[in-house]
Amino acid sequence: MEPESKKELQSPASSFVMSSETMWESTPRQPESTSLSWSPRKSLRSLTVFTDYCQFGYPTRSLRAGFQELPPLPEPQTLRLRPASLRTQDISHLLARVFRNLYTAQVIGDDLSDSLIKARGSEDARHEEFLDQLQQARAIYKKRLDDVAMLEKHITQARARDIAETEHATKQGRLHVVEAPVKLPPVKTVFRWCIDNELMQKHHLISTEDYYNDPLPFCPAPKRSPTPMYSKMTFSCEKRFTHKSDLERKAEEHCRKLVEFDDLEYTTDSLRSVSKTKGKTKVTIKKASTPANKKWMEHLQVPQRALDRRLLARMQNRNHYLKNPRFFPPNTPHGGKSLIVPSRKPERRGSLSAKPEWRCVCSSRRIPGNVSFRVNLDLVYGGPQTLASQGSVPEESGVLGSTSGMAFDPQGPRVRLFSAVRSRGVDPWEPVWASSGHPKWGGAGAGAYSHVTLAWYVDYLFLLL
């Protein structure tokens, strides 16, 4: 019975070993030279099968106690690189193999969690509870990431301020020191004043108070800067610009005292010397009714109104600007004008009040065969102007002499030509015409003319400087 029971207790591995041995034994034997090489090969085969079976336990115990075989281990993902590779340091497959119930290789990332939260609404209560926990975990994770970023930014800014202050203090100290004998930090660091210790302690980080034991210096609050003198009112300014409310209040108090004094009349009796008071009947003062036009309710007094108008005119005069000519074409009334050059004409040199004075002098000379003459026209209108004309007439004619000249017309840009004819019986060596008048109207001299004839008009542009 023992051999049968032993055969029943044999494991599949032993049966596999026996089957392999029988397979090798059933094959035809080779010569003696080859029989020696088959025996070690058969033992090697049986050893490899035995070691594969005993990978997770002892075969003797499993044979005696009858334990069941462990399920085969899952292989890692094919796309995951092995830790022996130089391109990765992932050990998740080791953790997944050792801690099967606590670790999974599939991690829920940001995209998967966002899609799960957005697509919630399932009827499964367990799934909804899982999504709630996932959402809370994601919120806590994001909050901690924000806190870490904020702390990192705060520490970076504190270090930058510390470096800037240290460099500034070092440059100021080197202005008076040629060379420092000891190469040490020349100034004390101000990092402890740039960082927030409460914030560091709140997030369980090392603060400057952990390694600085000296007490903080007591600094009083800064005092308020006094009011500068230029912003205070002077004595004359206070006297001149008194508030209107103060004046009205003083006037009302004065009027109230006068009314109270007038209400009582004190009389003295000569016999009893008793003062008696006689009350006067109060005269009811009718208040002015509200006018129909409410705009006249708050009217100003005449002096105040004049002052306001004067101030308004001064402000308008200061703020009056010419229209910008760049927005108007030159043919418009306000277009093409300059903002700097005034539009009015410049004043003429000389006296403007003086009236224009005309003076015409004519002289003649006898020449065989004819009589020559010369006319000098002097114009005084702001500045002296002299115009001259010469001419001659034959002596055989009935006219012994003739004069001609030019006159300026103030009414328009034209020059008037005129001539004077002298009769016989006048000495040709004497001046023909010496007169102060206006040649425009043909005024004659004192006895020198017989008549003056007006000739023709010639359009001529005349520039008066």
From Swiss-Prot:
GO molecular function: alpha-tubulin binding; beta-tubulin binding
Polar residues composition bias: residue spans: 11-38
GO terms of biological process kind: cell differentiation; defense response to tumor cell; negative regulation of cell population proliferation; spermatogenesis
Keyword rRNA processing carried by entry: no
Entry GO CC: cytoplasm
Region (Disordered): 1-38, 322-350
Claim: Transferase is one of the keywords in the record: no
Matches recorded under InterPro entries: DLEC1
This protein's UniProt keywords: Cytoplasm, Differentiation, Spermatogenesis, Tumor suppressor
The protein, known as: Deleted in lung and esophageal cancer protein 1 homolog
Organism, scientific name: Rattus norvegicus
Gene label: Dlec1
